[in-house]
UniProtKB/Swiss-Prot annotation:
Cited NCBIfam families: arch_flag_Nterm, PRK08541.1
Protein family per UniProt: Belongs to the archaeal flagellin family.
Pfam families from the UniProt entry: Arch_flagellin
Keyword Signal: no
InterPro entries listed in its UniProt record: Flagellin/pilin_N_arc, Flagellin_arc
Compartment(s): Archaeal flagellum
Record's function text: Flagellin is the subunit protein which polymerizes to form the filaments of archaeal flagella.
Alphabetical keyword list: Archaeal flagellum
Family annotation (PANTHER family): FLAGELLIN B1 (PTHR35903:SF1)
Propeptide: 1-4
Record's protein name: Flagellin B5
GO biological process terms held by the UniProt record: archaeal or bacterial-type flagellum-dependent cell motility
GO cellular component: archaeal-type flagellum
Length: 255
């Protein structure tokens, strides 16, 4: 009887151990499956972060002065494309940061919440580009009295000038250079996708030593300028150039 009881007890203990091991194995399998899925999701997210981003493909500066060497760069054109493998980049969430070592300016695109009463279409042009930096003299820009419907690149420049000088808005404009799928034509949320190219255009009004734009502003010769074009997600495009020691042309390639 005793041996039988001991045998039954041993069997019960053995069965209990098997059940505990089975439960533990189930927990381990479930946990490993969860961790595997989590790792795969994290890997995909990391890959997307690395691949996503924006690239600066060129920067041009413009001075309206005659001769050019007597003036400063008052306008910049920053050409951007998406990184290879990048998803769509909403330019409405992009920031352009510029610094000359004395100040750091942060430009943004139109925002429906911050810019109520304005239209996104004031700051984007998607037609043929005859000249991306049309000439303006002081009378042309100082006489701008309101926003205007955009029918040319010049209209975007004038609207940006008015926004900065009259409404104190740090805005950049967008000129569509290449856009096969029309993703950049959505003025409220222009999206830079594969094969697309856009020009971010901006005035250098913040680069003014006496805070009075009416008597001159801009980036002088031999000035080191650094910055970034920062998307909402992914890697930012690098801005890093030094302006020429002498401005010999009105339009200059800077980077």
């Amino acid at each position: 009887m005793r041996r039988g009881a001991i045998g039954i007890g041993t069997l019960i203990v053995f069965i209990a151990m098997v059940l505990v091991a089975a439960v533990a194995a189930g927990v381990l399998i479930t946990t490993s499956g969860y961790l595997q899925q989590k790792a795969m999701a994290t890997g995909r997210q990391t890959t997307q972060e690395v691949a996503s981003g924006i690239r600066v493909s060129g920067i041009y500066g413009y001075t309206p002065s005659n001769p050019p060497g007597s003036g400063k760069i008052t306008r910049l054109v920053v050409y951007v494309t998406p990184n290879a493998g990048s998803g769509g980049i909403d330019l409405a969430h992009v920031r352009v940061v510029l610094s000359d070592g004395k100040r750091m300016a942060v430009y943004r695109y139109y925002d429906s919440d911050k810019d109520q009463g304005l239209q996104a279409g004031y700051f984007l042009y998607a037609g043929d580009i005859e000249n991306i930096v049309p000439y303006f003299n002081d009378t042309d820009v100082l006489s701008v009295s309101n926003y205007t419907t955009v029918t040319s690149v010049a209209d975007v420049w004038k609207n940006l000038y008015y926004a900065m000088t009259q409404d104190n808005k740090m805005l950049f404009g967008i000129v569509v250079v290449a856009d096969d799928d029309d993703s950049l034509s959505n003025t409220a949320h222009p999206t830079l996708g594969f094969g697309d190219k856009a020009a971010l255009i901006l005035w250098t009004i913040p680069f003014d030593d006496d805070n009075d734009y009416s008597n001159g502003y801009g980036i002088p010769p031999s000035t080191k300028v650094v910055g970034k074009v920062i998307p909402e997600n992914g890697a930012g495009g690098v801005i890093d150039f030094t302006t020429p020691s002498t401005y010999t042309d009105n339009l200059m390639e800077l980077q």
